[in-house]
C-alpha cells in the first residue's frame, strides 16, 4: 500500500513538473513574439498620403507624426465565445500592436474561479499568423498556422486600427481609399491574399463601425469557410496618451441567421513606446 502511494505521488510530481516546464516554454514563446514586434520599424510620418477623414481621426487621437514610436500596448477586459451559439466566458488579455509594420500579439486568459484554465495566443508576426490555446497554460488543445490564418490575422490587424491610431499615420504597408462620404477602406497585402476592411465614421469623425467580406474562418461545423465580418466601436475617451474607443465588439454574419458577436470588451492601461 505504501509503495503504491509512493508511486502515485512520484507520478503526480512528475506530471506537475512536466506541466510547469511546458507552461514556462509557452510563456517564453509568447515573450519571444513580443520581442520580435519590438524589433519592427518605427512609425513613419505619412499624414500627407492619407484621406483627410483618416488623418484627422488619428490627429484627434493625439498622434504626433514622426514621434518614432514602435509599439502600442493595452490591457483588455472582455467576453469571448469560441463557437457559434456558445456561451460567453470572461476573458482578460494583454495586447501589443506594431505601429510601423503590420503585427500584433494578443495574450488572453480565461479562468474558472481562481484557477486559470485556458490561455489563448492570437498573433500576426513577421507576416505569419499564430493561434494557439493551452489548458492551464501547458496542455495544447488547439494550434493553427498557414496562409489562411495569416490572412485572417491581417484582417484583425486592420480592424483594430482604431485602437492603434499611431499605425494609421505611420504604417507604410497600409493603403487607404475613400469609398463614400463616411466610409474609408484600408488594405494590407499578404502572401495569402489582400485583407480589406471598411471603416464607417460618424458625424464627429470617429470610427464607429467596421465591416469586411471574405475573412477566413470556421463555419458552425468547424470547416474552413469565408464569412462576412462586422464590428463596432464606442465610448471614446482619453485612455493614457490617446483618445480611443474604450468599447469594441466583433462578430460574423452567418448564412441564414445573420450577425452574431463572438467578442466584446473594453480596453484600459494604454501605452505607446519607441
Question: Where in this protein do the model-derived segments appear?
Answer:
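N-terminal membrane-anchoring alpha-helices
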Residues: 1-40
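Buried hydrophobic residues that stabilize the cores of well-folded domains
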Residues: 92-95, 123-126, 132, 166-171, ...
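N-terminal mature ectodomain segment of secretory-pathway/periplasmic proteins
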Residues: 56-139
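Short, solvent-exposed coil/turn segments at beta-strand boundaries
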Residues: 94-106, 119-131, 179-182, 200-208, ...
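Short, solvent-exposed secondary-structure boundary motifs
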Residues: 80-90, 106-116, 158-171, 186-192, ...
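Gly/Pro-enriched, hydrophobic low-complexity segments
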Residues: 185-274
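Flexible, processing/modification-adjacent segments and terminal tails
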Residues: 132-190, 221
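N-terminal leader/targeting segments and the immediate start of mature chains
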Residues: 26-73
Amino acid at each position: 500500500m505504501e509503495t503504491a502511494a509512493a508511486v502515485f505521488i512520484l507520478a503526480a510530481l512528475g506530471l506537475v513538473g512536466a506541466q510547469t516546464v511546458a507552461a514556462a516554454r509557452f510563456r517564453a514563446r509568447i515573450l519571444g513574439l513580443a520581442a520580435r514586434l519590438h524589433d519592427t520599424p518605427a512609425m513613419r510620418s505619412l499624414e500627407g498620403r492619407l484621406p483627410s477623414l483618416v488623418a484627422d481621426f488619428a490627429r484627434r487621437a493625439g498622434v504626433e507624426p514622426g514621434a518614432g514610436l514602435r509599439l502600442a500596448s493595452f490591457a483588455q477586459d472582455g467576453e469571448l465565445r469560441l463557437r457559434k451559439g456558445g456561451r460567453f466566458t470572461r476573458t482578460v488579455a494583454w495586447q501589443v500592436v506594431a505601429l510601423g509594420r503590420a503585427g500584433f500579439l494578443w495574450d488572453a486568459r480565461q479562468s474558472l474561479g481562481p484557477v486559470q484554465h485556458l490561455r489563448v495566443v492570437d498573433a500576426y508576426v513577421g507576416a505569419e499568423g499564430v493561434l494557439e490555446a493551452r489548458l492551464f497554460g501547458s496542455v495544447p488543445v488547439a494550434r493553427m498556422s498557414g496562409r489562411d490564418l495569416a490572412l485572417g490575422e491581417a484582417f484583425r490587424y486592420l480592424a483594430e486600427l482604431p485602437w492603434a491610431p499611431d499605425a494609421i499615420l505611420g504604417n507604410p504597408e497600409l493603403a487607404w481609399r475613400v469609398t463614400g462620404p463616411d466610409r474609408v477602406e484600408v488594405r494590407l497585402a499578404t502572401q495569402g491574399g489582400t485583407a480589406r476592411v471598411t471603416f464607417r465614421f460618424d458625424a464627429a469623425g470617429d470610427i464607429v463601425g467596421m465591416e469586411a467580406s471574405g475573412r477566413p474562418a470556421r463555419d458552425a461545423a468547424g470547416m474552413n469557410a469565408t464569412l462576412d465580418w462586422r464590428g463596432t466601436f464606442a465610448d471614446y475617451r482619453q485612455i493614457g496618451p490617446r483618445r480611443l474607443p474604450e468599447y469594441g465588439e466583433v462578430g460574423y454574419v452567418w448564412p441564414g441567421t445573420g450577425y452574431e458577436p463572438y467578442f466584446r470588451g473594453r480596453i484600459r492601461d494604454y501605452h505607446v513606446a519607441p
